[in-house]
């Protein structure tokens, strides 16, 4: 497996990661009793294979329905906890709600610490403001870092390049998850800025 440094985290992340967006029975938040044995077993089989082949980074999000819960049960049942766990929490104008969402994700994932915590979907100026304002999401995450509940702080986005540049320029984030691939290289300038 090849590895790369992830943003300014100093974490060596595999070039292939295990994305948790489809590790869910439903986009809705369900009780675990509503997950069938077969549905959960599928998640656990994939975790076992991922571990076998060196996929040491798992990424999920609060908005991915039952994904965090199913991955957490999978980590517990298989004892295959990846080296790097990442989840994403949407920004919120109420810092108490945001903090509660982070704590719920830690609980669902059944871990003591989330290595990479991204503010999910900084897609508008309002989202960025909620993240960076005094007493906002970033301040909550800094507090949780001091408590060793989370590691590095980043953001994900489908926003315009100008907004992404503005977020990177705050120097408050350790990494960014964004779209960039062969047929869509619109964010090349932003990637170059992030590499500085």
Which residues does each predicted region cover?
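Acidic (Asp/Glu)-rich catalytic clusters
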Residues: 7-10, 72-82, 103-112, 166-171, ...
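Beta/alpha (TIM)-barrel catalytic core signal, keyed to glycine-rich beta->alpha loops juxtaposed to Asp/Glu
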Residues: 3, 122-196
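Active-site mouth loops of central-metabolism enzymes
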Residues: 22-41, 87-97, 125-129, 156
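N-terminal binding-site loop/beta-alpha segment at the start of enzyme catalytic domains
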Residues: 1-83
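Structural preference for beta-strand elements that scaffold enzyme active sites
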Residues: 3-5, 13-17, 55-57, 82-86, ...
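Short, acidic/polar
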Residues: 32-50, 94-110, 158-168
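Alpha-helix-loop-beta-strand connector modules within alpha/beta enzyme cores
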Residues: 68-87, 137-148, 196
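Active-site groove signature of glycoside hydrolases
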Residues: 106-129
């Amino acid at each position: 497996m090849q590895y790369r440094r992830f943003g300014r985290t100093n974490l060596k992340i595999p070039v292939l990661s295990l994305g948790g967006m489809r590790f869910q029975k439903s986009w809705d938040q369900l009780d675990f009793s509503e997950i069938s044995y077969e549905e959960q077993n599928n998640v656990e089989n994939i975790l076992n294979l991922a571990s076998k082949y060196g996929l040491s980074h798992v990424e999920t999000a609060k908005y991915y329905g039952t994904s965090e819960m199913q991955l957490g049960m999978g980590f517990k049942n298989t004892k295959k906890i990846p080296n790097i766990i990442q989840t994403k929490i949407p920004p919120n104008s109420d810092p108490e709600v945001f903090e509660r969402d982070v704590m719920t994700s830690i609980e669902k994932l059944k871990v003591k610490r989330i290595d990479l915590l991204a503010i999910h979907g900084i897609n508008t100026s309002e989202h960025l403001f909620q993240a960076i304002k005094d007493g906002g999401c970033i301040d909550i995450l800094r507090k949780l870092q001091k408590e060793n509940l989370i590691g590095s702080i980043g953001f994900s986005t489908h926003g315009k390049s100008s907004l992404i540049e503005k977020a990177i320029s705050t120097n408050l984030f350790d990494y960014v998850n964004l779209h960039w691939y062969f047929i869509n290289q619109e964010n090349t300038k932003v990637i170059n800025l992030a590499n500085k």
